[in-house]
Design a protein with these regions (language model features):
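Polar, glycine-rich mid-to-C-terminal structural blocks
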Residues: 1-19, 27
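Function-dense linear segments that define catalytic or interfacial modules
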Residues: 16-120, 125-135
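Short, intrinsically disordered, charge-balanced linker/junction segments flanking boundaries
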Residues: 137-140
């Protein structure tokens, strides 16, 4: 059976529009954006996590590890005036990463190696629509 590339792409885009999935990952673009220091080490990105939030290099020695958390923008007014809120979140994520490094079993040595070398963390956001509703902001 021959499948039209255009029809397949249209189906992917239509499904993405209706469901939010599948997550699309353009690996060439991710590798072009890889920091030069990692390129100089011969590293490359081979994939991402499921939701495409993180793109970290992997190879025979390393398995990507990133500690993620989110702030709830619906509660932005409550935490935005605290200058230490985001730095404290970053420190908390780094502490979680350190706990993993200190307690990881040998069976995940590649993940421990990556966590130790890169210390990747990420702070995302959720609740933007709820914040706009709370503030009475019309949005189309």
């Amino acid at each position: 059976m021959i499948v039209s590339a255009r029809k397949l792409w249209e189906t992917v885009l239509e499904t993405r529009y209706r469901t939010g999935e599948p997550y699309l990952n353009f690996i060439d673009t991710a590798n072009r954006a890889l920091p030069q220091t990692q390129k100089d080490l011969g590293l490359k990105i081979n994939g991402s996590n499921l939701c495409n939030e993180i793109h970290l290099p992997t190879n025979e020695e390393r398995t990507a590890v990133c500690c993620l958390s989110s702030v709830n923008l619906e509660n932005y007014d409550a935490w935005s005036k605290d200058p230490m809120f985001l730095p404290d979140m970053a420190e908390m994520l780094d502490n979680v990463l350190q706990f993993f490094i200190d307690n990881a079993p040998d069976t995940v040595a590649r993940a421990k190696y990556s966590a130790t070398r890169e210390r990747s963390i990420g702070i995302g956001a959720l609740g933007f629509h709820a914040y706009l509703q709370k503030k009475g902001v019309a949005w189309e």
